[in-house]
Regions:
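Amphipathic alpha-helical scaffolding segments comprising HEAT/armadillo-like alpha-solenoid repeats
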Residues: 2-15, 23, 34-46, 54, ...
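Short inter-helical turns and helix N-cap capping residues of alpha-solenoid HEAT/ARM repeat scaffolds
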Residues: 17-18, 48-49, 80-81, 119-120, ...
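Specific register positions within alpha-helical solenoid repeats of the TPR/Sel1-like families, i.e.
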Residues: 93-97, 167
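Eukaryotic acidic, Ser/Thr-rich intrinsically disordered low-complexity regions
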Residues: 147, 151-170
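Extracytoplasmic
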Residues: 165-304
Length: 304
């Protein structure tokens, strides 16, 4: 990835393509991501070339981590050009909804602040959509205040967000010990058909689509590093790759080659600030078209 970014940057900086091609390259760089790429794009956003700034903003909503959030937030609050400001908000919202270094508490405060800034109804609706993903008491209070608005559309979105945040809060796990086990039966389960908790052993089964996923809202009272492993079995004809996400960090692992429950190490994850974050497990690939990824019983966070 970084090598591809270097080549794109070389063409952009050294060969100086004409404006139309330059804008296309800026958009490509925005989709690819990477620390060096972001440093270049950030300088463009701080500059005066309006067309180049727009080209960068068009792709930042798909950035692979939360690196652009602070810069985009500053643009939303202080940019004088209304088009640039609106584009920054439309890039900021999907990034805010994705896992990142920002805790749910920080995301809640950001949504409350930005919601009051003049923006379109669709932009406000999208912000409420992000609010519905969170698991904080402040998010619940803000959703409740939106549900009480005279604007019927805002009120309906606020009511939906209130219900979602209430459900999220009911699932919050608070880290207390060196060894913390998140049971699949306590997760928020997102999928279709038979993808659900099996009451006989408490595992989630029916993982027939790699896009299915589970979420645990977890409150970390302090910063720290954690080794994460999953306890799972591979059903006959199944198996594949999966991803674990926490606080914007990602780890990829493969299922075991047997149908017995066993622990699968994923990697070390760092929580840099106290707060509530989501542990997310999603599929990447399933080895056989008609197979199932795994039967997932639990996730373990071990402090180190």
């Amino acid at each position: 990835m970084e090598n591809r970014n270097k080549e794109v940057r070389r063409v952009l900086i050294e060969e100086g393509p004409i404006d139309e091609h330059r804008q296309r390259i800026l958009r490509i760089l925005g989709y690819l991501g990477g620390e060096s790429a972001w440093n270049d794009l950030k300088q463009i956003l701080k500059g005066n070339d309006q067309e180049a700034r727009k080209a960068v903003l068009q792709s930042l909503g798909s950035w692979p981590n939360g690196a652009p959030l602070e810069t985009l937030s500053d643009l939303i609050k202080s940019e004088k050009d209304s088009i640039i400001r609106a584009m920054a908000l439309r890039a900021y919202t999907p990034l805010l909804s994705a896992p990142s270094y920002l805790s749910d508490e920080m995301k809640t405060e950001s949504i409350k602040e930005i919601y009051e800034i003049n923006s379109s109804r669709s932009d406000k609706r999208n912000l409420i959509g992000v609010l519905a993903l969170l698991a904080t008491e402040e998010a619940l209070k803000f959703a409740e205040s939106l549900a009480a608005k005279d604007d019927n559309l805002v009120a309906s979105y606020g009511d939906l967000a209130y219900k979602r945040v209430s459900e999220n809060l009911s699932k919050v796990f608070s880290v207390k010990e060196d060894l913390n086990v998140l049971k699949s039966s306590d997760a928020l389960v997102f999928g279709e058909g038979s993808f659900a908790v099996d009451e006989t052993d408490g595992s989630v089964k029916g993982w027939s689509n790699p896009q299915f996923y589970l979420v645990w809202p977890v409150n970390f009272p302090e910063s720290g590093a954690y080794d994460i492993s999953v306890n799972a079995a591979t059903p006959s004809g199944g198996g594949g790759e999966f991803e674990v996400v926490l606080a914007g960090e990602r780890g990829i692992a493969r299922t075991a080659n047997n149908n017995e429950y066993s622990d699968i190490a994923v990697g070390k994850f760092e929580v840099k600030e106290p707060g509530t974050y989501r542990v997310i497990i999603s599929g990447i690939t399933i080895d056989q078209k008609s197979g199932q990824l795994m039967n997932l019983r639990s996730v373990t966070l071990k402090s180190n």
